[in-house]
Amino acid sequence: MPSPADHAPEHVRRLGKVHHVALIVRSIEDASRFWRDALGLELEAVQDIPQDRVRIAFLAVGESKVELVEPTDDTTGVARFLASKGEGFHHVCFEVSNLAETLLRLEIDGLELIDSAPRRGAEGPVAFIHPRSCHGVLVELIEAPGGPSWESLGFPPHG
């Protein structure tokens, strides 16, 4: 049976590339040594994300990235995930052309969203879809560089 969102424009119904795969780690320094030294990935950046109480690192691999996520506060969801499941896979992130329109379509389709509107992420506007709607997988969406949410969230113009 067709969804009400089936009439959405093509750019709202299609995902772009895999932006990154995120891994929860105890130590970015230890984990990045493996990914950089053993597998040859290039470390792009390490940064603190105070609002999420994590430290992250991005390592380039082809047109995508591996994101290492280290909790900086033992009371966060990321810290609880690490304590209960250990290091490993956390989420996959897909690029979309218009995040707000995509979230609206997903909501119309009945998916459970963690973020109902774009919010500021490390590399652009982001939102998460709850694992209950994704067969147990946490899915992040990131708006493509220069998309409509960039300016409203205070990101610089992307050229």
Give the positions of each predicted feature.
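Short, structured motif recognition centered on aromatic/hydrophobic residues
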Residues: 18-25, 35, 59, 66-69, ...
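Long, hydrophobic N-terminal alpha-helical segment
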Residues: 2, 6-54
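C-terminal "cap" of GNAT-fold acetyltransferases
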Residues: 49-65
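Vicinal oxygen chelate
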Residues: 2-12, 25-33, 57-58, 67, 72-73, 84-159
